[in-house]
């Protein structure tokens, strides 16, 4: 799984701390999380882009687990693909409530062998 996060932060260190806090609920489902890249987002000052590679445990996340996890980020998200291979969480969606004010947007991409049946 690949996760790209856009977070409000003042430094790399702060962005990593926010990222770890936000993703603490995913630890139950992962064998390994690794930050691949972190940098200020060139389009918007005050936002950092963090990219993570995540190795899921042998059992894929089922729909119930996924929904429970997503509800820790926001009340609304978009999913793409059949079966689902991408999820978008963004404060730009009408009615969206982010449960961490530091989140601007999160993209979650699922590996082909770990795709969720919808």
In which residue ranges do the predicted regions lie?
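Short, extreme N-terminal segment that most often corresponds to the first beta-strand
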Residues: 1-25
């Amino acid at each position: 799984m690949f996760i790209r996060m856009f977070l409000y932060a003042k430094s790399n260190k702060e962005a990593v701390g926010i990222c770890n806090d936000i993703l603490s609920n995913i630890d139950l489902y992962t064998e390994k999380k690794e930050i691949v890249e972190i940098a200020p987002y060139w389009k918007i000052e005050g936002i950092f882009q963090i990219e993570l590679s995540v190795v899921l445990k042998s059992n894929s996340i089922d729909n119930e687990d996924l929904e429970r996890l997503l509800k820790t980020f926001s009340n609304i998200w978009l999913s793409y693909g059949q079966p689902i291979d991408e999820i978008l969480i963004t404060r730009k969606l009408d009615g969206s409530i982010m449960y961490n004010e530091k989140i601007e947007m999160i993209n979650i991409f699922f590996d082909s062998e770990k795709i969720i049946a919808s």
